[in-house]
Amino acid sequence: MMTGPAGCGKTMAAKALTKGLNRPDYYFNLGATQDARATLIGNTHFDSKKGTFFSESAFVKAISTKNAVILLDELSRAHPDAWNILMTVLDQGQRYLRLDEAEGSPIINVAEGVTFIATANIGGEYTSTRVIDRAIMDRFTTIEMDVLNDEQEFGLLKYMYPNVNEEDLKAVAEIAHHTREVSKGGDGKLSTMVSTRASVEVAGLLYDGFNLFEAAEIGIFPFFSNDGGADSERTYVKQLVQKYVKDEKADEKLFTEPTEEDSETIVW
């Protein structure tokens, strides 16, 4: 199980691992699961000709595939019903799934070589997440993923967007790193940080022709609260970004509201 802050690359790393193993792979987003039993076991249907019949889920097919790699994404957002169903599947001493919706409640054994990889966000910052059952946690080896430092972040952004100005990419990496360090400090200046996912989004906007401040307005500022006015988290981050902005007019964007003269120049 890979745990860590949102946007630090857990799912990307898990998918890269799956691809690198060159084995059959299956992806299940448990955070988007409304009906755990239907997703993991299957559904009972009615047909006017066939009558009532049971349809196995894609998960049943996955665990029945030899040497399959199964990615259970957003495990911390899964309904407890999903955890209960997964208990026997993930237990090394059991490794089976009972299809209690099917006639006779047959047992499906997990095929030889099947590997499970899970991702989870753990912490009070994430809404709609649950404290993962200890019994589920014990069924995984946990890898705690940390955020990248500024040099690593810059290397990633440069790799993904080699044609973007290096100074701008370094600025994005340093801004992200600064917010991470401050949010860890506990002094109350920032309650959250710029994730790697957000950094990549900002780099993409730079590639599309936005300047740094414009990209930050879209990809960074909305994550920080505006409560408190001049003392707000958003103002703090805007001032941080401003240190890296070359456009002197961007200073005016920190606090200045559009004037009537400005509004007259806007073409709708």
Please place each PLM-identified region on the residue numbering:
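Alpha-helical lid/collar subdomain of P-loop NTPases
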Residues: 149-268
